[in-house]
Amino acid sequence: RPQDNFYRYSNGGWIRKNPLKPAYSRFGTFDILQDTATSQIRHIVEELIAKPQTKGTNDYRVAVLYKQSLDSAERNRQGYKPLIPELQALQGIQTKDDLLKHIAQQDQVYGQGCLFGTGVAADEKNSTMNIFLFTQTSLGLGSRDYYVESTPEVKQILAGYEAYLVRILKLSGYSDAEASRIAKATIRIETELAQFSYSNTELRDSQKNYNIVTIADFARDNKGFDWSGYLRLRGLDVATANFMQLNFFKAF
């Protein structure tokens, strides 16, 4: 009945006739575009690997990467060994300076934002120029709600996340005690970050996410993190930036 569930009343027939495939949580125009693009890229890559490539060329690199990605037997043989240098680097962090250097290195070498993200985009109030951006981090569970809400369902999800972290850490060579300690510390840090993260509603507010500040002024007023030092370690000459989720960065 429309008074019970108007969405089902108006769309129910179409939904029943067009059930979602098990791999999809939704399926629309953009999903069709993505599937088409993925299929086309796969066709291009499979043509590459079917013939010899000259070592050092981009075609060669693509072919090698694709073959390595499919070689699950070799990945299983190596286990977590390729990650050992990264794990050792994390274990070597003792001071704020160590942490600063590690974050800058991860961003610069791998493009992997730690604690926060960075990028460049068009200035929303001056489309003739681009501007450097600082953005809040993506938490392990995605939404901040999983960390700040206290419903039974959320608590169950958080407990499952902790169990998952423990399992991954144990597979990476950590003892049961160490795995449990690191997993709890990870959730504690992510929960603290979530306290200052913008909600999904706030992230859609373009005005609230437009906070142009000079690096010098922001660094002077927010000394919990060496913002100027971070940019210097990355070799970036940035005078002004958009700290999109301003309260998140002030919390540092």
Spans of model-derived segments:
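Active-site-surrounding "flap" and adjacent substrate/cofactor-binding loops of secreted or lumenal enzymes
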Residues: P2-D4, Y9-E74
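Noncatalytic, helix-rich "gating/capping" subdomain that lines the substrate-entry/channel surface
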Residues: E47-F252
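Short intrinsically disordered, low-complexity coil segments enriched in acidic
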Residues: R1-P2, A251
